Structure formats: C-alpha cells, structure tokens
C-alpha cells in the first residue's frame, strides 16, 4: 500500500460545515450504482434485506446473520475483554456496519435506585401523621414533658443520666391509636364480629388476632351510629415509631397479617399479638353508670417496620426511642433516581484510551487496523452523526438510543403566576359539618304569637335528639393551583440547587460523603429560595441553577425511558445489543480472509451507567456482571459473481475504502482553576492548511473522567458526561476569545463590527448597543454562530431550514431572557432583608423547611412590587443560555475575509508556511475546577487497504495535527 509520503499532494477543501463524512473512489461509486438493487452503501445503518434470486449455490449464502462466539475471554474487576475470530468465506463480503455485540449479564442498580417520585406506601397520609402506636413514659407526666422539651439541648452524658433516672422511675405505656371496626361486643377473647348460626346455638365469632381487625376496614358510611364496641390494631412500643407516610411492614401470613412471628414451645412460628382493653375514662363511667366495661380493644403487635422510599425530614430529638414527641416526626419521599445504561451505551466500550483500544487485525499480517489516539472523539462524534441523519427525539430501543434531555420549564422558569380567581373548597362528608342537638317543640294554645306571648311545648312526634347545623355549610379552603405550582418549583428546582444552599435537617443522621445518595437525598433547602413569588411575571432561570447540570434531573425523559427499558426493579438480568462506533471500522466492508477482532468492555458502574442524581454508584452499591458477549455480523446478500467482482475492485489500492471521522477534530482539555477568569492556550508553530476552525465549550472537572485509564479511581460521579454525550450546559460562561497568530496579519480582521484578534461573546455593560436579541450576547458572536452553523451571513426574517437546525445546533438552543429587579441605589427605602427574616404566606407554609406550616397570617414583606402605582425603581438584567451546542469559530478561505489579503487575494495565513497560535479565553469565575474543551477541526481520515486474504492495512491522516494531539 502506498504510504502518504509517496502519494500526490492532497487538495484540501475548506468548508465550514461537517457534511463531508465519507469519500469513495469513482470506481467504487460506479460499482455501487450498478448494484444498488442488491445493497446500499449508505452510512452506519445499511439495510441488507434484498436477497439475490440467482447465482446462489449454497445454503450459507442465504444466511444473512451469523453469530460469532468469543475464542478468548478475560474477565477482570474493571473490564471484560472478548476476542473473536472472523472467518469471511470466499465470495462473501462482511458488513462491519451491521455488526453488534450481543451482551447478556446481570445488573444491580444498587439500593439508591428509585424510579418514581413520591412514595408507594400510604402516599395519601399527611407527612406528619403517625401510625397507631405506643410508647413508654414516666408516671410524672409533667416531668416527662419537660424532659421532651429539653431533649434537643442535652448532650450524651446528660442523656445517659436521664435514662438511669427514668429506669428507676415507674414507666407507663401511652397509646395513640384508632379503632375503626365496630363489633357486637368485647370479651376477654376480643372483639366479636359475628355469629356462627350453623349449630343449634349461635356461636360467637371473634376477630382472628393474626390479621383482624384489618386496618383497611371500618365504618362504611359517614353517619354510622357510635360504636359500643370497637377494635383496631396498634404497634407495640418495641416497634420503632415512623410516620404513616412511607411506612411498610411485610405480610407474615396469607391474610395480610403483619405480626412478627415468634416460635412457640414446639418451635412453630406464630404471630405474637396481645389484646389491650380500654374503657371510658372514670368520670364518664360514673356519669353513665356503666361500671368498668371495655369499649375498645386494640390488637397490639410488633411488625417488621420499613421505610423503603422515604426518610425523615424532621425529627424532634436525637434518639430513636418511642416517645410522645416522636409523634411529630415528618416524613419526606426519597428523591427519584433513575439508573440506566447511557445513551447509545456510551462508556460501555473502551474508546479514546491508551493501551485499552480494540483490535481488528488480519491473521496473515497481524497489523492492527485500530490505532491508539487518546483524543479520538468517538462517542461525541457518534452523537452528532446520529443527529445529522435522523431525529434524536425519536427513541430507538435496540441501540438504547434515547437522548438526554431536560424539561425546558425547569431550566428556564416562566413564572406567570397561578390562575386562582375562584376559591377551592373542601367539605365534610355529610355536607353540613358541625351540628347542634335540638329538641322539637310546638306552639301551645291558640294565640297568634305575634306579641311574643306564645308558650311552647315539646313536640312528641319528633325524636328527642335532632342534629341541625346553623349558618353556612362548614368548609375549608385550599388554593390548589398555587400549591401545585409551589410544589413543582420545590421538587424540580429547589431540590437541585447547589449544595452550598442546603442544610442538614435537625437530628437526622446523614452521610458525610457529598457524592452519596444518602447525602444528596436528605439535604433540604428553604422553599423561600424558589417560591411562587420569585421572579413573578418573568422568564428567567435562577442564577444559582445556570451552572448546575440540567440533564441530571428526574425529568430527563431519555434517561427515564432507558431506565424503564430495563424495568422498575433493582436487580436486572439484561440482554443488550451494542454497535461499534469507531469511525475506521464501523462502516468497513471486510473482504474474504480470517481476522482477529477484540474489544474491551468497561465494568465501572460510574462510566457504564447513568443516574439522574449523579451519585457515586460505586460507593452506593451498584454493580454489573457480564455473563456472555457474542458478536452478530451480517453478510451482504449478493450473488457469488457480484461478491467476487466487488472483492476484486476493493483489493485494488485505487479503490481503498476511506472514512472521515464525523467530528474530524483533535481535542484538548485545559484546566481552569476555581474562580479563575483567564485561560491562555499556546499551539506550537505549524502549517494551518486544511484547518477548519475551532469548537469549544466548558466542562466540570468532576463530570469528566480520565479516559486514559480503564478505571479512574477519582471519578465519583454518574450523571451525564458532556465530554462524551454532548450534554453541554456551560456555554453562557464565556465572555471573550482572543486569537493571535505569530504573523503581522490580524485575524480576524476589522470587518463589520469585529475587533481585530478578538471575538466578544457577551457584554454585561453595553453602552454602545452591541448586544442582540434583548440579551447580553453581542451582534458579532450571533453573526459568527449563524455563519458557522448555517452559512447565514445576513439577518432579516430568515431562520435556518429545519434540516440544518438540529438538536445540537446553535439556533435551536439559544435562549435569551431578561427581568427587572429592584434598583437598590435609586430606591432609597430599600432594605436587604435576609431569607431568615423574609415572610410571604406566613402561617400557611413551613419555616425555612419543607415541614409543617407555622406562624400567623400577616402582610408579606417580600418581594418589592415592580408593577402598579407603587412600583419601585428597577433595573433590567439580561442574560442567555445556550446548552448542547459547541461554540464554533470557522477558519476557512470562504468564510468572510476576516484578515488582510495578498495581491493574489490569498490570506497570509495560507501563504506563509507555519505559524504558532495563542488563544486567550475570558470566562466567568466558577467556584469549582472546570475544563476548557477545545476541538481543533481538521480532516481526520483513514484509508483502509485489503490487498490479500487476511491482510488489512490502515493509514490515518490528520492534518494539521498529524499525531492526533494539539501540542504535536
């Protein structure tokens, strides 16, 4: 095969787009046209469905798909390596574009997997309502109450002393319970719930203590008479107190009973249920003359109490011992955490990693066609390729294609208030509510009664007790719309605020590792930070949320779909199909011969799996195990003579297969320390011929794994990985880009509004009116992005065509916004009131926490009115967001004349031989380390030559970064 140095000089095309993805020789194009009824030489997903109808002599030729079993496996703690021998027979052509790895294994998504919001257990219960329960308390109740109040302030030593004093005192059991089931009578055998009339003498039937009375059965209508005998179940003092919301105890018998089984004398496990009898209080007994008779029986039991999907958001004391104060615990649902394989199985196969790449080698030559380059953008390139050939919003389950997304109403809040003109009422079940008892009377005598001298007497035709309510129906009001909107804001925005704005709930145990689910789940935030009155009437994203990854969210529809594909349980036996993405071999036509094909598959759960919270799945107990990895491959269904003709043509080096990487770029990551604002870059001197431009964005260090190692021990995150999947969201943090070549030529020039050697992205102060679209992006930058993405060099009423305006493009993701805020310099009455002292809806909401409402109804002191006759002085704030896309600066001979030209009309950068490059990026400071991700757009081409059976040779050409690295 000819080496690049022996080949004629390539003629470079300077293009601004990424459309030139594959080049075929004229001979191969002619052949493809002649045989287009048999197969299609398109992109990744060719469709080999038309089998030939003649010249087929063997059964094997009709078998389109074959399964290859690995000849060697290597299963380690961090990876699984599979090696295959591909035998391509005579008159066959194997289509590498159709190959996929068929993988079976077992996935443990860990105890932090929760594929829903809210709770599955008693979701309708109030958050602070206890179960029917019991606790012990000292006989001196006054002292006990005082102890409860002081409990929070005591340290451990005082608690131990207090405990000893309590042990010496007399303890009594207290009960807080409900007895919903009415019975006929109560005896020492319990509650009689019926009679067995089968025998001559009716035999009473008592509740079966193992499961009766059942908690779900009680009075079936609102006006049932008061029960003389009632029963219910109650949890013993030895069962830990938990709020009813979220509490669960597994059944221990087929009837649904939940009592803990205790072995009897013979070792047979039986439910341990004790009957507790209760009468009216003494004063009532004396008044009614009832002596002491049971009115209520409670069936007390211990159960296996669990809270599978909730946790405590408020706890009165540090201890877990049952007490009266513990009745006031508040429960809160665990945060949803979807866990699934990444979009297109990103991260599952090793790419871009030194020493861990795959192998495709002919067994006759053993030359590997896969060349190690640490900055191949294989995963990102594949994402952008798919976007260019199809609609990424349509999911394709076979390849796990469901693109990461976010709810735009969560990223940018359009707070237009709540439509709550009419009040919403709720009424008592009987409609009337509180009634008084009346006696019917009638007029006595024949007088008219107009003078008020009528006498009245009891009306014996009516009952003695008649229930009558006076006035309007009893009702309670709730603002449903405002509550729903407030809950949306808290669940979707407040809980995702940066951790520095959150705090630990009092007395609640919490992990000290901020990467764990336990820590993320239990931290709470004051609802007032994101309430329904914040930025009311504006379309604005919370400034705190702009730099938070919006794709790490339970409303990431793509991740939710991929999670549901696996099911809704923690343990999943999975069976998946994974395509090859490496550009040099994903579209290859493999000619007859025997080949070795080998690849590595990661087992690092943080890389392979994606979670909506981004917690450290390694620490939180997730794991993945591969049981088998097979390879499925498809042969072109061609007649033998057609296949042999194609083989003969492809063996000729003039018909080598050439493939361009879709992204065709060398990437570099430059660290940006926390709070830094300037990032300088230097590129050594080189010839810039064939250079297409720059694309850049910003990544968080925490969210970017080290691809050079198979297992990065410092990678403690499992959310979206912008570096690989294109979920960029920090584009708005760039201010300026300065570009300086070491020549006297200024680039860009001073055309239009462009400042020489500089691109200004946004302006906070815009005295000259350079900004555009009512935000702080400059007109220059808007123009450059429209040119780079759509070749639109002028404005007017012209927006890009839909086929150009794809998911990752600029125009679709550009979101300008503005709002007004109080001008604290002009408005002299302004007071900077801290959140601790702000009140709005006081008395109707919890104080600084998602807990029980407290306070009183009172005029609000926040926010200042920006409308109406009393509107205060205000200033306008402007900004924009532009997620998913890469900022692009084209560098091409047909992209505007952005520099001085020679007499021949040629830019000096092309005329001169080599230049060094200095770039300086000015960015907004962020309080954590980040990375500047720069793609140097080049021509990244591979030529594949198969001169003989079992021989495959490749030449990779990347100009002007020949070795694949921007520093070489």
Swiss-Prot record:
Modified residues (N-acetylalanine): 2
Site positions for Involved in interaction with pre-protein VI: 793
Region (Disordered): 125-188
UniProt KW keywords: Acetylation, Capsid protein, Cytoplasmic inwards viral transport, Host nucleus, Host-virus interaction, Late protein, Microtubular inwards viral transport, Phosphoprotein, T=25 icosahedral capsid protein, Virion, Virus entry into host cell
Chain positions with Phosphoserine modification: 182, 283
Keyword Acetylation in record: yes
Bias (Acidic residues) ranges: 147-162
Pfam families per the UniProt record, alphabetical: Adeno_hexon (PF01065), Adeno_hexon_C (PF03678)
Chain positions found as Phosphotyrosine: 956
Quaternary context: Homotrimer. Interacts with the capsid vertex protein; this interaction binds the peripentonal hexons to the neighboring penton base. Interacts with the hexon-linking protein; this interaction tethers the hexons surrounding the penton to those situated in the central plate of the facet. Interacts with the hexon-interlacing protein; this interaction lashes the hexons together. Interacts with pre-protein VI; this interaction probably allows nuclear import of hexon trimers and possibly pre-capsid assembly.
Stated family: Belongs to the adenoviridae hexon protein family.
HAMAP family cross-referenced by the UniProt entry: ADV_CAPSH
Additional note from the record: All late proteins expressed from the major late promoter are produced by alternative splicing and alternative polyadenylation of the same gene giving rise to non-overlapping ORFs. A leader sequence is present in the N-terminus of all these mRNAs and is recognized by the viral shutoff protein to provide expression although conventional translation via ribosome scanning from the cap has been shut off in the host cell.
Full protein name: Hexon protein
Lineage, top ranks: Viruses, Varidnaviria, Bamfordvirae, Preplasmiviricota, Tectiliviricetes
């Amino acid at each position: 095969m000819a080496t690049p140095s022996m080949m004629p000089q390539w003629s470079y095309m300077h293009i601004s787009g990424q459309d030139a993805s594959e080049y075929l020789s004229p001979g191969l194009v002619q052949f493809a046209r002649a045989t287009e009824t048999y197969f299609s030489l398109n992109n990744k997903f060719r469709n080999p469905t038309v089998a030939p109808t003649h010249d087929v002599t063997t059964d094997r030729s009709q078998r389109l798909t074959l399964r290859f079993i690995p000849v060697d496996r290597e299963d380690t703690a961090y990876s699984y390596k599979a090696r295959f021998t591909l035998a391509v027979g005579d008159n066959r052509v194997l289509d590498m574009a159709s190959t996929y790895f068929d993988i079976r294994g077992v996935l443990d998504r860990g105890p932090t997997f929760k594929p829903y919001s809210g709770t599955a257990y008693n979701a309708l219960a109030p958050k602070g309502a206890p179960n029917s329960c019991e606790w012990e308390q000292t006989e001196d109740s006054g002292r006990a109450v005082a102890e409860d109040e002081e409990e929070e302030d005591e340290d451990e030593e005082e608690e131990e002393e207090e405990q000893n004093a309590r042990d010496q005192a007399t303890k009594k059991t207290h009960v807080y319970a409900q007895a919903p089931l009415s019975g006929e009578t109560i005896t020492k055998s319990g509650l009689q719930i019926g009679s067995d009339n089968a025998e001559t003498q009716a035999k009473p039937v008592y509740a079966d203590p193992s499961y009766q009375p059942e908690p779900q059965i009680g009075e079936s209508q609102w006006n049932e008479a008061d029960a003389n005998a009632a029963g219910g179940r109650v949890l013993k003092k030895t069962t830990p107190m938990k709020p009813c919301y979220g509490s669960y105890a597994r059944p221990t018998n087929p009837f649904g009973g939940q009592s803990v089984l205790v072995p009897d004398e013979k070792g047979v496990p039986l439910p341990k249920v004790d009957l507790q009898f209760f009468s009216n209080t003494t004063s009532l007994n004396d008044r009614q003359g009832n002596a002491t008779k049971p009115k209520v029986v409670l069936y007390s039991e211990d159960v296996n109490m669990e809270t599978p999907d909730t946790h405590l958001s408020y706890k009165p004391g540090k201890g877990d011992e049952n007490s009266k104060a513990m009745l006031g615990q508040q429960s809160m649902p665990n945060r949803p955490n979807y866990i699934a394989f990444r979009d297109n199985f990103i991260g599952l196969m090793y790419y871009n990693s030194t020493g861990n790449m795959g192998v495709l080698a002919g067994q006759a030559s053993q030359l590997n066609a896969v060349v190690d380059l640490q900055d191949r953008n294989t995963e990102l390139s594949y994402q952008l390729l798919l976007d260019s050939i199809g609609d990424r919003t349509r999911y394709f389950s076979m390849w796990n294609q469901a693109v990461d997304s976010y709810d735009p109403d969560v990223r940018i809040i359009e707070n237009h208030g709540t439509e709550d003109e009419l009040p919403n009422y709720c009424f008592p079940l009987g409609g009337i509510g509180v009634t008084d008892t009346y006696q019917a009377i009638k007029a006595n005598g024949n007088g008219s009664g107009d003078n008020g001298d009528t006498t009245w007497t009891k009306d014996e035709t009516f009952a003695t007790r008649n229930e009558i309510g006076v006035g309007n129906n009893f009702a309670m009001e709730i603002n449903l719309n405002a509550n729903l909107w407030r809950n949306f804001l808290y669940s979707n925005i407040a809980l995702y605020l940066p951790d520095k704005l959150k705090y630990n709930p009092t007395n609640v145990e919490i992990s000290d590792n901020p990467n764990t689910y336990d820590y993320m789940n239990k931290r709470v935030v004051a609802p007032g930070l994101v309430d329904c009155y914040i930025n009311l009437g504006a379309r604005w994203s919370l400034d705190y949320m702009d730099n938070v990854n919006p794709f790490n969210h339970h409303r990431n529809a793509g991740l939710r779909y991929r999670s549901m594909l696996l099911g809704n349980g923690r343990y999943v036996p999975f069976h998946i199909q994974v395509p090859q993405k490496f550009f040099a071999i994903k579209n290859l036509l493999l000619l007859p011969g025997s080949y070795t094909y080998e690849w590595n598959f990661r087992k690092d759960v943080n890389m392979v799996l994606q979670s909506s919270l981004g917690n450290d799945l390694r620490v939180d107990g997730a794991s993945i195990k591969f049981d088998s990895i097979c390879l499925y491959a498809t042969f072109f269904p061609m007649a033998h003579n057609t296949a042999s003709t194609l083989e003969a043509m492809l063996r000729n080096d003039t018909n080598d297969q050439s493939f361009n990487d879709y992204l065709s770029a060398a990437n570099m990551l430059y660290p940006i320390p926390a709070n830094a604002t300037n990032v300088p870059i230097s590129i050594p001197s080189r010839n810039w011929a064939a250079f297409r431009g720059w694309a850049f964005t910003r990544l968080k260090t925490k969210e970017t794994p080290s691809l050079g190692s198979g297992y990065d021990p410092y990678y403690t995150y499992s959310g979206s990985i912008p570096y690989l999947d294109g979920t960029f969201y920090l584009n708005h943090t760039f201010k300026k880009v300065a570009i300086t070549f070491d020549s006297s030529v200024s680039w860009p020039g001073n055309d239009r509004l462009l400042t020489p050697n500089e691109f200004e992205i946004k302006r906070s102060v815009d005295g000259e009116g350079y900004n555009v679209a009512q935000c702080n992006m400059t007109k220059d930058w808007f123009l450059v992005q429209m040119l780079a993405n759509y070749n639109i060099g002028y404005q007017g009423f012209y927006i890009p065509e839909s086929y150009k305006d794809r998911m990752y493009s600029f125009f679709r993701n550009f979101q300008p916004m503005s709002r007004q805020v109080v001008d604290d310099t002009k408005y002299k009455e302004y007071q900077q009131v801290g959140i601790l002292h702000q009140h709005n809806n006081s008395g109707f909401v919890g104080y600084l926490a998602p807990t029980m409402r407290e306070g009183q109804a009172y005029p609000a002191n926040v926010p200042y009115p920006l409308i109406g006759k009393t509107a205060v002085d205000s200033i306008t704030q402007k900004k924009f967001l532009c997620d998913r896309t890469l900022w692009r600066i084209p560098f091409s001979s047909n992209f505007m004349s952005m520099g001085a030209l020679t007499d021949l009309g040629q830019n000096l950068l092309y005329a001169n031989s080599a230049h060094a490059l200095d770039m300086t990026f000015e960015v907004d400071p962020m309080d954590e380390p980040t990375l500047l991700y720069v793609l140097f757009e080049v021509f990244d081409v591979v030529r594949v030559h198969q001169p003989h059976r079992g021989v495959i040779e490749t030449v990779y050409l990347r100009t002007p970064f020949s070795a694949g690295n921007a520093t070489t």
